[in-house]
Amino acid sequence: NETVFAEDPYLLFDVFRYAQQHNLKLSENLKRIIRKNLPLLKDFKWESKDLKEFLFSLLNAKNSFKIFQAMHEVDVLGLLLPEFGKCKFQIHNDYFHMYTVDVHCLQSIEKLENLHFNSEKELAEFSSVYQSISRPEILKLSLLLHDTGKAEGTDHIETGLLYLDNIIKRLGLEKREAKTLKFLMKHHVFMNHTAQRRDLSN
């Protein structure tokens, strides 16, 4: 059915959940059908609780990167999180980032998740800390969104925080979740400075 997602938008959630749970890739035909239906979904109003539950279920899994990359490839991620969609193909204006903003944010999640399976001695402590985090989905969401403010070409942290306010309302996040996300967004550049100028083993 070529219009199946327009008839029932929530089937999109089922497709990506199933693909993640069974470690499957989307077929080219399914990608085509999803893309074809996107214009019909742009004005659809997702329920906050359903959108939050869907995104957090994906973020709670160990392979969030793969499924978010697949969602981004067919522009579903930008449909659900327009703030992220704005930074697609956006180039960083510095010497430190090799990839576009969208790819950088997704790869940040990949690097974090790789710590779970880490076997390198020098990363053992970081791996242990990561596995002790009680709400990894919040940390991953902050990574996904941390540079989205660069889409406007202004102060990306200030813009990112404005974007984040909209996302917090749209997802209906709890006060503690919102506070943590804002803290991570506001101070993420400090992590960059620390990584470049400090001995992380000290």
Where do the model's predicted regions map?
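Non-catalytic interface/linker regions that flank or bridge core catalytic/transmembrane domains
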Residues: 1-95
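Predominant activation on well-ordered alpha-helical scaffold segments within soluble catalytic domains
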Residues: 13-16, 106-109, 161, 165
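Structural motif corresponding to the C-terminal cap of alpha-helices
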Residues: 1, 23, 116-120, 147-152
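Non-catalytic alpha-helical coupling and interface elements of nucleotide-dependent molecular machines
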Residues: 20-24, 39, 60-63, 73-76, ...
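Conserved phosphate/pyrophosphate-binding and hydrolysis machinery centered on Walker-type P-loop NTPases
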Residues: 5, 44-48, 61, 98-105, ...
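Active-site-adjacent "gating/activation" loops or surface patches in catalytic cores
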Residues: 73-89, 93, 99-143
